[in-house]
């Protein structure tokens, strides 16, 4: 096995100064900047604000909203974290061990607050008490659902928090927006976000604080061993090798045309402008059709067929650097071309890794359902299917303005069938098929895996920890594929780069327990102040970067047009020492940041490897130049491009009805310990849905009829129309 160990710096940053906080005394008033403003008298305690501005008869001016005041040291019992004991506000025993010293020079023990939350305590004048059970958002809320008197703030999914808020168990945060100027300003500036968290359009009720893991940017992307693509496709003359395997008997059939011409937009090679390229099927034919006609062929023949196809189909556009079709700034690859490439990769392990076996397409953890579902997400990207990377269930807004459910559409099952064909040809990893233990780290460390679909930063750090970068090994994000998408602008569809994987409100958040705070105004105001603080500039940096001791003082850099802090050298070294360069794990496990509020991507960007930045740069330029299309965080003029809200405003009656549609929840789970019938179809074929089903339309009809999909969609469509009306009324 190959692994490069990164040298670690021994010097740590200077210790962070601390401030003592009094546990009792006069009230704390939170100012407009989110900071305590000295003290206010006990009589200045804020009363709950009514929804909307209050006016007095005969006057035009609304009364100023009361400040959020609470006693110093007000305790908030927090059942909050992110899917694991390691990612709570407090150090768990495994992470802290016998004591862990961080880059701030402080030593932390099990049960201690993490540095970010120490700073929040000091900043706001609150005290946090740990109640987190270390569960996923849904399981954490279910654990506390009958114990809400014992917690003040609790994690949950957006759907669960809203459903239980409507039932009266969680505080309507929307009622207090006038007292939360920073949160309100953020929602006013991002109306689709407000729509995404509004649980009741008649009152404007909001029952949870949303979580953004970055906003308005691509989330997942394809990643490939680009050095392998270059080795197979680039250069003058024919490819040759002393040994190769034979491709499997062909099963996969063409998705793209077999004749005619298709013109698509690409970014030019130097990334400065968009241009058009033509896929000429009249001249080159379809590569899958040609390979299928040839049957089982040796790997060398397969590579030379693909080389010739690229030269002819693109009229020499890529020259001898044919790999750019897949991995270049000007990439224009599609599903058929990827299948041809996978056939070449799997049939040429002797050239690529010196063994007799390579796995083509894999997932981050082939035995973890939460990661296995990335395979059907990728299917949507490959074959032009909306709803498989939705922000809510499997919903998307069609070009007809109505809500659609991917589970009830034949195109979904056709796409999954295509991936099943790839399974039959051995192009998808055996561990994925067998649901056995294997992960992206071991695939790359042992040169056994070619590509997967995932997050850029966490996966490209494997270039530093698993690959031999100095020998040219390179795992990098590549442009999203060209597919036929039916956005309504052409009845025959549009061949274009499109991603549905777009950052908006995530499906988790934090709610305030009505029974927990009871009639304690201090607790209510402290909880509301915490949420509002997260939307100040100071709060956003603290909750993304951690405290000042982890930041290089006096230095900033330009990130998306805004000056953002630079992380301290000791922080950067510690990131590699403790988390192998994984920003998200480091921030959550050790700093306590990136939890449930607005995560600024500037920290993560600095922690991204040069290879990670290179691939992401290609994609970012594609987005900026309009080559890569994506959902929009607004109600778009063409409704097909509208991002689906994370929740839709359904009534208690609706929620009770929806909860009875258990197949739609259990059969399509994306949880770690759940089971996804969509994944099962990829592995076992369409019959995995039900043994009576033999085609895609029958599968869609089965979900619609036998599993109450039709009734589910009617409820969601009604809620969507109500949400649209509310959105228009707020403009």
Go through the PLM ranges and name each one.
Residues 19-23:
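C-terminal motif of bacterial Sec signal peptides marking the signal peptidase cleavage site
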Residues 196-214, 257-323, 330-398, 448-451, ...:
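Extracytoplasmic/periplasmic solute-binding protein
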Residues 533, 537-681:
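Conserved small-residue motifs centered on glycine
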Residues 25-205, 213-224, 228-320, 405, ...:
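Conserved N-terminal structural module of periplasmic/extracytoplasmic solute-binding proteins
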Residues 222-226, 230, 505-522, 542:
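A bilobed periplasmic-binding-protein/Venus flytrap-type ligand-binding module shared by bacterial periplasmic
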Residues 131-140, 335-337, 433-445:
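Short helix-initiation/N-cap motifs at beta->coil->alpha
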Residues 99-101, 174-189, 231, 235-241, ...:
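Short, solvent-exposed loop/beta-turn-alpha elements that line the ligand-binding surface or hinge
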Residues 396-430:
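Glycine-centered hinge/linker elements that transmit conformational signals in sensory
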């Amino acid at each position: 096995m190959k692994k490069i160990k990164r040298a670690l710096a021994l010097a740590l940053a200077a210790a962070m100064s601390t401030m003592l906080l009094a546990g009792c005394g006069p009230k704390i008033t939170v100012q407009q900047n989110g900071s305590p403003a000295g003290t206010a008298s006990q009589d200045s305690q804020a009363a709950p604000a009514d929804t909307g501005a209050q006016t007095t008869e005969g006057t035009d001016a609304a009364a100023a909203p009361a400040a959020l005041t609470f006693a110093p040291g007000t305790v908030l019992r927090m059942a909050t974290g992110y899917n694991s004991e390691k990612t709570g506000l407090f150090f768990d025993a495994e992470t802290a061990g016998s004591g862990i010293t961080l880059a701030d020079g402080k030593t932390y023990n099990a049960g201690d607050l993490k540095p970010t939350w120490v700073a929040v305590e000091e900043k706001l004048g609150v005290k946090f008490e740990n109640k987190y059970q270390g569960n996923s958002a849904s399981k954490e809320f279910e654990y506390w659902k009958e114990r809400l008197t014992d917690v003040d703030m609790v994690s949950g999914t957006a759907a669960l928090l809203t459903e239980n808020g409507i039932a009266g168990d969680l505080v309507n945060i929307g009622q207090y927006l006038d007292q939360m100027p920073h949160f309100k300003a953020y929602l006013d500036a991002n109306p689709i976000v407000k729509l995404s968290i509004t649980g009741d359009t008649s009152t404007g009720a909001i029952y949870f604080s949303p979580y953004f893991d970055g906003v308005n940017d691509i989330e997942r992307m394809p990643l490939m061993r680009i050095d392998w693509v270059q080795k197979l496709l680039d250069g003058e003359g024919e490819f040759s090798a002393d040994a190769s395997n034979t491709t499997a008997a062909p099963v996969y059939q063409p998705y793209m045309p077999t004749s005619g011409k298709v013109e698509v937009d690409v970014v030019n090679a130097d990334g400065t402008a968009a241009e058009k390229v033509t896929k000429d099927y009249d001249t080159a034919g379809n590569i899958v059709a040609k390979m299928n006609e040839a049957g089982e062929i040796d790997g060398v023949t397969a590579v030379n067929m693909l080389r010739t196809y690229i030269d002819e189909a693109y009229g020499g556009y890529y020259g001898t650097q044919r790999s750019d079709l897949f991995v270049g700034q000007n990439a224009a690859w599609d599903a058929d071309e990827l299948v041809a490439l996978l056939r070449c990769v799997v049939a040429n392990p002797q050239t690529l890794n010196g063994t007799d076996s390579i796995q083509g397409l894999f997932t981050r953890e082939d035995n973890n359902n939460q990661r296995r579902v990335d395979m059907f997400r990728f299917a949507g990207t490959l074959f032009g299917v909306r709803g498989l990377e939705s922000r809510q269930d499997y919903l998307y807004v069609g070009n007809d303005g109505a809500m659609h459910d991917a589970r009830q559409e034949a195109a979904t099952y056709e796409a999954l069938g295509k991936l099943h064909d790839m399974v039959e040809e051995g192009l998808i990893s055996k561990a994925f098929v067998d649901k056995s233990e294997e992960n992206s780290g071991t695939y790359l460390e042992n040169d056994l895996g070619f590509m997967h679909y995932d997050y850029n930063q966490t996966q490209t750090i494997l270039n530093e920890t698993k690959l031999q970068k100095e020998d040219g090994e390179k795992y990098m994000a590549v442009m999203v594929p060209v597919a036929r998408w039916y956005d309504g602008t052409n009845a025959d569809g549009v061949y274009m780069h499109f991603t549905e994987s777009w950052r908006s409100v995530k499906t988790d958040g934090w709610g305030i327990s009505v029974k927990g705070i009871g009639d304690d105004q201090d607790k209510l105001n402290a909880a509301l102040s915490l949420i509002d603080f997260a939307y100040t500039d100071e709060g956003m940096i603290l909750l993304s970067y951690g405290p000042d001791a982890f930041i290089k003082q006096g230095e900033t850099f330009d990130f998306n047009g805004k000056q953002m802090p630079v992380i301290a050298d000791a922080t950067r070294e510690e990131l590699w020492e403790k988390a192998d360069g994984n920003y998200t794990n480091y921030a959550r496990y050790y700093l306590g940041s990136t939890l449930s509020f607005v995560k600024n991507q500037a920290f993560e960007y600095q922690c991204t490897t040069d290879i990670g930045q290179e691939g992401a740069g290609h994609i970012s330029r594609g987005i900026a130049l309009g080559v890569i299309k994506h959902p929009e965080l607004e109600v778009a003029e063409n409704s097909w491009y509208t991002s689906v809200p994370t929740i839709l405003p359904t009534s208690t009656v609706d929620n009770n009805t929806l909860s009875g549609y258990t197949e739609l929840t259990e059969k399509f789970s994306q949880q770690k310990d759940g089971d996804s019938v969509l994944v099962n179809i990829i592995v076992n074929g369409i019959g995995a849905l039900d043994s009576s089903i033999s085609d895609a339309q029958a599968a869609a009809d089965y979900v619609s009829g036998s599993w109450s999909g039709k009734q589910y969609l009617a409820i969601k469509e009604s809620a969507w129309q109500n949400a649209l009306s509310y959105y228009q009324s707020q403009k």
